[in-house]
UniProtKB/Swiss-Prot annotation:
Residues 1-28 form the signal peptide. The keyword Signal applies. One of its GO terms (biological process) is lipopolysaccharide transport. Pfam families: LptD_N. It comes from Rhizobium meliloti (strain 1021) (Ensifer meliloti). PANTHER family: LIPOPOLYSACCHARIDE EXPORT SYSTEM PROTEIN LPTA. The keyword Signal applies. GO terms for cellular component: cell outer membrane; outer membrane-bounded periplasmic space. It comes from the Bacteria. GO terms for molecular function: glycolipid transfer activity. This is Uncharacterized protein R00383.
Amino acid sequence: MSVKPAALFRISAALAVAGLGASLIASAALAQATSSRMQGLQLSNDQPIQIESDKLEIKDPESKAIFTGNVKVVQGTTTLQAGNMTVFYKAGGGSVTSGNADIDRIEVSNKVFLSSGAQQATGESGIVNLTNQTIVLKGKKVVLSEGKNVFVGCQLNVQMDTGEAQLDACGGRVQIQLDPQSRKTN
């Protein structure tokens, strides 16, 4: 099946939201509590997005596109990697092959890695819900880092439109390691 560039652009724009979710990763403010306001989502409409995978399967009747094996999405300094990624689009909102799909959510699984600049996040799976503007990253161990500052929990919830974020420990305790050298001096 051939995929039109416009279709890939629409998928890419949605994937940029997933990949750029990494820019929401831990700031020093998160050290004050497990619930905090994080940096805002910054999308770039003028940078190209590159998507690679071992396989792409488009299932228009099921309103989804499945990327399988070594999935990598890159835009500027932002990278999303996962073993698998499924893009769900709204029924009746157009098809991926026609280039006018209305993306509902993106699910990634099998060793998820998000990176934006000096910030990184890892987990076992994640969901970017474009309808309610949320990102959820889950795993036995979700690790957020920026330089030598490290935050560990099992689930990260981010409200993209407000920047509110919460890192849960899932029955254990949230772990935070801060490097005093990372503080900004005035």
